[in-house]
Curated annotation (Swiss-Prot):
Coiled coil: none annotated. GO terms for biological process: photosynthesis. InterPro entries: O-mannosyl-transferase_TMTC (IPR052346), PSI_Ycf3_assembly (IPR022818), TPR-like_helical_dom_sf (IPR011990), TPR_rpt (IPR019734). Its main location: membrane. It comes from the Bacteria. GO terms for cellular component: plasma membrane-derived thylakoid membrane. The gene is ycf3. This is Photosystem I assembly protein Ycf3. TPR repeats lie at residues 36-69, 73-106, 121-154. Keywords: Membrane, Photosynthesis, Repeat, Thylakoid, TPR repeat. It comes from Synechococcus sp. (strain JA-2-3B'a(2-13)). The keyword Thylakoid applies. It is a peripheral membrane protein. It is found in: Cellular thylakoid membrane. Essential for the assembly of the photosystem I (PSI) complex. May act as a chaperone-like factor to guide the assembly of the PSI subunits.
Length: 173
């Protein structure tokens, strides 16, 4: 039984049953696509329970089967989330960048890249490397600006940071 069916949550079980029914009824959905979706769904279930190794395994299987670029971008993004949660920031950045290559309008990936770059900038500042910190802050600003241009009502803290640091070279309203 797939992990997603083991969940005791009624809403999750209902979603899983509905998703399975939709997949069965949709014409043109290959068995590979169905398998990819099942692995992705099981990866999300494992990730939500903090079972990151299992989630990554499912995401890798889904990635091997999935053909659609947008769907692949979300798989890569979720893998980045896991690496970020585990403190593997450089690896998380790699996965977020891969997700953006497939889906340049994935705001959450843009935001997470900016957050990680800002964090690295703070670490550089603490280490006394102001030049590297400034470069990282400027790079973070560029990612936040891209995200804000796509979703102007989001990332209010980032917008405030951009304004207070003089890096806001855009009008979003």
């Amino acid at each position: 039984m797939p992990r997603s069916m083991k969940n005791d949550n009624f809403i999750d079980k209902t979603f899983t049953v509905m998703a399975d029914l939709i997949l069965k009824l949709l014409p043109g959905v290959s068995s590979e696509q169905k398998k990819a979706f099942a692995y992705y769904r099981d990866g999300m279930a494992a990730q939500s329970e903090g079972e990151y190794a299992e989630a990554l395994e499912n995401y890798r299987e889904a990635l091997a089967l999935e053909q659609g670029e947008e769907d692949r971008s979300y798989i890569l993004y979720n893998m980045g989330l896991i690496y970020q949660s585990n403190g593997e920031l450089d690896k998380a950045l790699e996965y977020y960048h891969q997700a953006l290559e497939l889906n340049p309008r994935l705001c959450s990936a843009l935001n997470n890249i900016a957050v990680l770059l800002h964090h690295k900038g703070e670490l550089s500042l603490q280490a006394g490397d102001e030049e590297t910190a400034e470069a990282l802050f400027n790079e973070a600003a560029q990612y936040w600006i891209r995200a804000i241009r796509i979703a102007p009502n989001n990332y209010i803290e980032a917008q405030n940071w951009l304004k207070t640091t003089g890096r806001a070279n855009l009008e979003v309203y």
